[in-house]
Amino acid sequence: MDFGIGFISTNIMLPILDFFFGIVHSYGFAIIALTLVIRLGLYPLSAGQIRNMRKMRITQPLMKERQEEIQKRYKDDPAKQQEEMAKVMKEFGNPLAGCLPLLLQMPILFALFATLRGSPFSDINYTVDLQILPQEQVERIVPQTFSTKPQNIYVDEALHYPIAVFLPGGKMLGVGEKTQLEIQSTEGKAFNQVIPEKNSQILTPTYSVTKGEDRISVNPDGTIEALVPGDATVQVTIPGIAARTGFLFIKALGQVGVTGENGEINWDILGMIVFFGFSIYLNQELSGASGGGAPNAQAQQQQTINKITPILFSGMFLFFPLPAGVLMYIVMANVFQTIQTLILMREPLPENLQKLLDEQQKATQGRESLPFEKKSSKKKEKTS
């Protein structure tokens, strides 16, 4: 049994999504509600990560100074050097400790991402690989039923089934032989039997040959005819019932890419990508990722990286496009993260950290700026 991302998606994400859809009767609002519930549930973990990051940013200069001092003092005694380094880590904390909350969140966030990339927000594809053999070879092979991995398919609002594609005679066909692709639930019901009549046209499967077009032919009803020996691949596509549903300024939740088939710009998707990049930049500014400690060349370099990062992450969606519904989730999650960061960065620091921060700021104010430093780098961090 699958207890990974698929299990979380099927047994946690989809029931929550169905619950909210039953209340608001809008897949767009259901996505927002699902995102907020998951982010609120993960709040303690992400809050711990932000607090640890804030602490390490303040203590890093002193920690680095101690480590360099230990390396010089015990350069001829590796065992003693390691012992003293361990004491420093115990005093200041391990910088990698902030990664643990992130790692604990990843399976849930990936499951949420996978849920929104599936039905009903996107078309679902099944791949069937076939091997066409000469008739005399097929006669010596015992047929074995083939089935694809089941996927959750929404056949109506808040109604879904695990659906798979079957080949009763197996994947090996003889030249001139015909077979029928059968779409069924895991309980053995034909796909057209579980679809409400009102959605029969919307959910009509389509069949296409993605490899070996000269070796097989596929009819609109899923009948395959083997033509010549070789390998071939058939793709079965079941439409998502909400893929073409709009929400607020979004034309279709399943729409993919900044440009459409005719080259027109999808301004709704482009707007979300730009806002996503802006939210990353704002989050970095709020978390003080470009500040802390005494300004130096390394801090200046970090400022440049923080300006480039939003552009890189936003540009990624131009080359790896996602459905509009998934982009909306990512934007909402980033907005939540930004608000969370704003709240946590205003928390009063512990007395020892506040004292250390005050000393760093006094040292920064007490020296002249170097030519490559900007005046903005001397701004104080707000602690309340």
From Swiss-Prot:
Major location category of this protein: membrane
Pfam family for this entry, one: 60KD_IMP
GO molecular function: membrane insertase activity
Annotated TM spans: 12-32, 96-116, 311-331
GO biological process, one term: protein insertion into membrane
Disruption phenotype: Merodiplod cells have greatly altered thylakoid morphology, and about 40% photosynthetic pigements, photosynthetic electron transport and oxygen evolution.
Topology in the lipid bilayer: Multi-pass membrane protein
Subcellular location: Cell inner membrane
Coiled-coil region: none
UniProt keyword terms in alphabetical order: Cell inner membrane, Cell membrane, Chaperone, Membrane, Protein transport, Transmembrane, Transmembrane helix, Transport
Chain positions covered by the region annotation Disordered: 357-384
Similarity remark: Belongs to the OXA1/ALB3/YidC family. Type 1 subfamily.
Subunit structure: Specifically interacts with transmembrane segments of nascent integral membrane proteins during membrane integration. Interacts with the precursor of PSII reaction center D1. Coimmunoprecipitates with CyanoP (tlr2075), FtsH2, FtsH3, Phb1 (slr1106), Ycf39 and Ycf48.
Its biological purpose: Required for the insertion of integral membrane proteins into the membrane. Probably plays an essential role in the integration of proteins of the respiratory chain complexes. Involved in integration of membrane proteins that insert dependently and independently of the Sec translocase complex.
Protein name: Membrane protein insertase YidC
The organism of origin for this protein: Synechocystis sp. (strain ATCC 27184 / PCC 6803 / Kazusa)
Organism ancestry: Bacteria, Bacillati, Cyanobacteriota, Cyanophyceae, Synechococcales
